């Protein structure tokens, strides 16, 4: 149970970091 929760949290963190980097790159390209 704990391993599944930690793995899900890791996926959420990775997704948020990648999405943030992608949005940042798009903003830099727009400038």
Swiss-Prot record:
Keyword Plastid: yes
Annotated localization: Plastid thylakoid membrane
GO terms under cellular component: cytochrome b6f complex; plastid thylakoid membrane
Membrane topology note: Single-pass membrane protein
A Pfam family per the record: PetL
Domain of life assignment: Eukaryota
Transmembrane annotation, as ranges: 4-24
UniProt-listed InterPro entries: Cyt_b6/f_cplx_su6
Gene Ontology biological process terms from the UniProt entry: photosynthesis
UniProt KW keywords: Electron transport, Membrane, Photosynthesis, Plastid, Thylakoid, Transmembrane, Transmembrane helix, Transport
One annotated GO molecular function: electron transporter, transferring electrons within cytochrome b6/f complex of photosystem II activity
Coiled coil: none
Family: Belongs to the PetL family.
Quaternary structure and partners: The 4 large subunits of the cytochrome b6-f complex are cytochrome b6, subunit IV (17 kDa polypeptide, PetD), cytochrome f and the Rieske protein, while the 4 small subunits are PetG, PetL, PetM and PetN. The complex functions as a dimer.
Protein task: Component of the cytochrome b6-f complex, which mediates electron transfer between photosystem II (PSII) and photosystem I (PSI), cyclic electron flow around PSI, and state transitions. PetL is important for photoautotrophic growth as well as for electron transfer efficiency and stability of the cytochrome b6-f complex.
UniProt-recorded name of the protein: Cytochrome b6-f complex subunit 6
Phylogenetic placement of the source organism: Eukaryota, Viridiplantae, Streptophyta, Embryophyta, Tracheophyta
């Amino acid at each position: 149970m704990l391993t599944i929760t930690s793995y899900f949290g890791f996926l959420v963190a990775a997704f948020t970091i990648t999405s943030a980097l992608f949005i940042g790159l798009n903003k830099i390209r727009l400038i």
